[in-house]
């Protein structure tokens, strides 16, 4: 298949590899993005790609807690300017309170719910769109629960660009739970611990690391041992409890949580716009479009 400049750009953003290396990888793998990433890693050219590191939309994340329930949501706008608008921020808080109180199962169900004065949630959002003048989208939300013996940790980074809610079992130390949430915001683990990683993902990583070691010219008899050592680093990158704690790198997150008498039950991390492709206008075209719109 034809390898486009956009494909090369995307692979560069995902791996940090050079343009020609990315083009070669895509050509060798017939345009398959995931296989091209593996190709670059096996050659030692790129690190593992982060699946959700492309922040391309605007908006806010927000967390609402009440008793033993917490809600995290993401509300998208088209521009950062609107995300800082008081009306948009008020809408975010209103929606969070409504969703936590009414507990819809899906975004579709949430939009169809009655809000106030006979209007639905979707109609309420549409009224805000009319006032603010920009498309606003309720992208996602999740409700988590705990018991009286547990603690929520809620953390919003950069005014809501990243939101994290954690649940610690066996302790009511909210400060500790928030510290873990801050760590999750900064390091972005995928899983709580190694047990949560699928056998398929581990085997895939083992194969990539094995090929990488062989390509480095390592003797076959020591490759297996090397791979197991590198797998340990792989787990440290993706598993929360295996990571060095950001507030005290001399201890693991597991040790920090255990020192508080708790265990991590779960976490949810939202970064605004992750995984969303934003249309990129040529600046000159954008200006012309605005001029035409004013005629």
Swiss-Prot record:
Subcellular location: Cytoplasm
GO annotation, cellular component aspect: cytoplasm
Positions of region (Involved in Mg(2+) ion dislocation from EF-Tu): 79-82
Highest taxon, organism lineage: Bacteria
Functional note: Associates with the EF-Tu.GDP complex and induces the exchange of GDP to GTP. It remains bound to the aminoacyl-tRNA.EF-Tu.GTP complex up to the GTP hydrolysis stage on the ribosome.
NCBIfam families: tsf
Name of the protein: Elongation factor Ts
Annotated organism of origin: Bacillus cytotoxicus (strain DSM 22905 / CIP 110041 / 391-98 / NVH 391-98)
Origin organism lineage: Bacteria, Bacillati, Bacillota, Bacilli, Bacillales
